[in-house]
């Protein structure tokens, strides 16, 4: 599978959009994490339909809708992928509010290693020498963190191991990123509405924080753009490269946690993150080199 410049840019854009959320959710107080997740689902639906209109994807969405009912196995798979995504959304919203953004970032540091393993074992993808060095650097950093803490956070574990089956299943389903996101949101909508009803009247929260009327729709817009970009990149890139580029997100998460959310970073942890930052630089260099080769060959 060739390297797509568009896929690389989409992956980077998704990472930047996603890492705005840990700080963003603090602006949504006094809503709690469950309320924020439910609102994220509800407000993502109109925003993703606006995205469909803006990108003129109605024919694609209509074709995917027809295929959904023509192939019953797809109809059975979407509730499963929706549940997988809801789990990750819940952790991503809850962790910053619980002061666990650094643990979340460690999970995202582990995720690309899992994705590279998936690419190698299930798709027969080979790593370039620089990619192999990048993975080794990242693995060294992760192992140092385990040695340092003598513990394994469940937040990190669920984040690292939850996404690979999701990406594999979505790739197997062969539904475009935007249509798949629409279907998953529609499957989650009844659950989100039920959660908001069960959690009770929110009028007091909106009176205390009128900004919620603007911030909640914006949450849906950020979610729609970020997830659409991520899924599009996952289909345009080889699984291994897609996994390695995912290191950009935890680096940014780390910076948000330390610089903006005030989470503690001990000097000895530098030996965890320095090899991982080196892995990111090597990956970017290797991706640029491969893209230049393709351009010279006219691919």
UniProtKB/Swiss-Prot annotation:
Location (main, coarse): membrane
Name the UniProt record assigns to this protein: Chloramphenicol-sensitive protein RarD
Higher taxonomy: Bacteria, Pseudomonadati, Pseudomonadota, Gammaproteobacteria, Pseudomonadales
Record's keyword annotation contains Ligase: no
Name of the encoding gene: rarD
Localization annotation: Cell membrane
InterPro entries found in the cross-reference section: RarD (IPR004626)
Family: Belongs to the EamA transporter family.
TM ranges: 8-28, 34-54, 74-94, 104-124, 126-146, 147-167, 180-200, 212-232, 241-261, 271-291
Source species of the chain: Pseudomonas aeruginosa (strain ATCC 15692 / DSM 22644 / CIP 104116 / JCM 14847 / LMG 12228 / 1C / PRS 101 / PAO1)
GO CC entries: plasma membrane
Membrane association type: Multi-pass membrane protein
Alphabetic keyword roster: Cell membrane, Membrane, Transmembrane, Transmembrane helix, Transport
Highest taxon of the lineage: Bacteria
């Amino acid at each position: 599978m060739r390297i797509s410049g568009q896929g690389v840019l989409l992956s980077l854009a998704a990472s930047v959009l996603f890492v705005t959320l840990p700080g963003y959710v603090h602006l949504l107080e006094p809503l709690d994490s469950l309320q924020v997740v439910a609102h994220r689902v509800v407000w993502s639906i109109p925003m993703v339909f606006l995205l469909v209109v803006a990108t003129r994807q109605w024919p694609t969405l209509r074709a995917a809708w027809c295929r959904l009912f023509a192939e019953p196995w797809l109809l059975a798979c979407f509730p499963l992928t929706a549940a997988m995504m809801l789990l990750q959304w819940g952790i991503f919203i809850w962790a910053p509010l619980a002061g666990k953004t650094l643990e979340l970032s460690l999970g995202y540091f582990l995720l690309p290693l899992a994705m590279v393993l998936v690419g190698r074992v299930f798709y027969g993808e080979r790593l370039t020498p620089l990619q192999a060095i990048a993975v080794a650097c990242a693995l060294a950093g992760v192992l140092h963190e385990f040695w340092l803490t003598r513990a394994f956070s469940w937040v990190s574990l669920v984040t690292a191991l939850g996404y690979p089956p999701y990406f594999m299943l979505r790739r197997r389903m062969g539904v475009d990123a935007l249509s798949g996101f629409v279907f998953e949101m529609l499957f989650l909508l009844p659950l989100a509405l039920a959660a908001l009803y069960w959690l009770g009247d929110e009028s007091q929260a909106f009176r205390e924080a009128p900004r919620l009327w603007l911030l909640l729709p914006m949450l849906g817009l950020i979610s729609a753009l970020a997830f659409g970009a991520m899924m599009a990149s996952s289909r345009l890139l080889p699984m291994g490269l897609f996994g390695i580029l995912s290191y950009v997100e935890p680096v940014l998460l780390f910076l948000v946690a330390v610089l903006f959310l005030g989470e503690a970073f001990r000097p000895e942890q530098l030996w965890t993150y320095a090899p991982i930052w080196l892995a990111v630089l090597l990956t970017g260099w290797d991706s640029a080199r491969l893209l230049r080769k393709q351009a010279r060959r006219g691919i």
